[in-house]
């Protein structure tokens, strides 16, 4: 069979076609990032070979001098990026260049709006890698051979970025990957030695491998010689005092494949009982798969400067999965695996220290005030809310970083800290009050807040799906207990006057018969009927039992297909309300039952719950309206 007969034309996966189209149209204003992306990929390939060769040094094939070559041909209008890294087989090429294996890609692409500015940010969050070549090239060729494979197992891939690609076998002596970009007429300016050198310095100065180009020196003996155009020193190994902010930012873009600067970073070298260096970054924007807890995450792990793996998730807890960075340890062995990392006491110690460091970075950002921490919270707050359940030892610190909506601001924006709340507590108030609801508007207008409005007490409004679950793990902050205003007995502390307490006790005695009649009328729908100290304007409300599951948690469990434990609400009535007073005078038992049911259903709706039988509620209401009309 001839080589030509083995040439195949294949179609790109639908998502790739969409991404190519979007990139070519959305990223033209930042074309030069193609070089950073392709050099980053080449650097990853060198890293992977160096790691694989730890177990089998024959993979070096007699050449362990790892470098990335950059070449150009002005007349032909081409740029070539070549590495002598791990290389690819035919199957690797199809998997890596013809499809996108990231989970959630289709959902991500649905978010794109056609607004070029917004889309370029979203694509930046996604990480475009190899496909960025098509921003400047109208044809891309890839020649590659996997390390350890015979020369005849080379692969030649070619595409014009128009929906399909060809792939054929090729003989290739050199292992690794060579990418040839055939530049678009308007982008021929990139086929220039000075331009390429300046882009390498700008974007790829601190990758770990040398990027070499042919010397353009006028001196005869140096012409055509290779020269290294980047620093090629791993950035994290340098003293902090020698690193400019701009270099930190570019290094972040290299490891995170992000287009934007990071929000903040922390570079730290630890010596002594543990010996490691960490460089941690907080991104400005959430990646598209942030809420997928199974998505790859973690830090780039190096052991004694040797790359080991990309997504070492064992060094940070899941609730800090947005953190990017590098960890370089001298205490781990070079043959470390993911399994070993899970059970290593050194890793556990480093994880504890890095978790504290990330939380300290966030605390520092929060103390600065301004928009930066608010921006972080808007992007990553929901994930940080997983923290109290996952990290008992740092619970207080995490709680201090949480932000809430509140009756103080009256707005849905989550910008109130617990310290803010405590600073505004009323004299005699000893608890932090909060309410949970399906959405901000429903929670804000809940009848449970009436007594708090009357007494001028601030209540935190929690309307994210995760909130009720999170509060199950937060019992107190700064010595103050949390209280859900719609759960159990409401303790207002010394804010509730003796007169208030006396009024409630007397009302309970005076209306004992009414409470019993309502309980009988509602049969097994409620666990208790009692006089309220929560309401000032509404006739009645539902209260969740102290140890029962709230509405939010029930919905989460139902959505997960889990059985929800049976529980009945407490029905509280406001005996000073005209409707309740009218109910008390009703002699007819059937009509009393109907009125009690209407009050109960209204209280159910006001608490954000669904009615079990909406039709029956509407019928009762219609009968009452007809009576009024007659």
UniProtKB/Swiss-Prot annotation:
SMART domains for the chain: HATPase_c
First-listed, main subcellular location of the protein, grouped into a coarse class: cytoplasm
Subcellular location: Cytoplasm
Annotated region described as C, given as residue ranges: 556-630
Coiled-coil regions listed in the entry: none
GO molecular function, one term: ATP hydrolysis activity
GO cellular component terms listed in the entry, alphabetical order: cytoplasm
Region named A: 1-338
Pfam families cross-referenced by the UniProt entry: HATPase_c_3, HSP90
Residue segments, region B: 339-555
InterPro entries in the record: HATPase_C_sf, Heat_shock_protein_90_CS, HSP90_C, Hsp90_fam, Hsp90_N, Ribosomal_Su5_D2-typ_SF
Alphabetical keyword list: ATP-binding, Chaperone, Cytoplasm, Nucleotide-binding, Stress response
Matches recorded under CDD domains: HATPase_Hsp90-like
Ligase listed as a keyword: no
SUPFAM superfamilies per record: ATPase domain of HSP90 chaperone/DNA topoisomerase II/histidine kinase, HSP90 C-terminal domain, Ribosomal protein S5 domain 2-like
Membership in a protein family: Belongs to the heat shock protein 90 family.
Assembly, per entry: Homodimer.
NCBIfam families assigned: PRK05218.1 (NF003555)
Stated role: Molecular chaperone. Has ATPase activity.
Protein name (Swiss-Prot/TrEMBL): Chaperone protein HtpG
Organism: Marinobacter nauticus (strain ATCC 700491 / DSM 11845 / VT8)
Gene this chain is encoded by: htpG
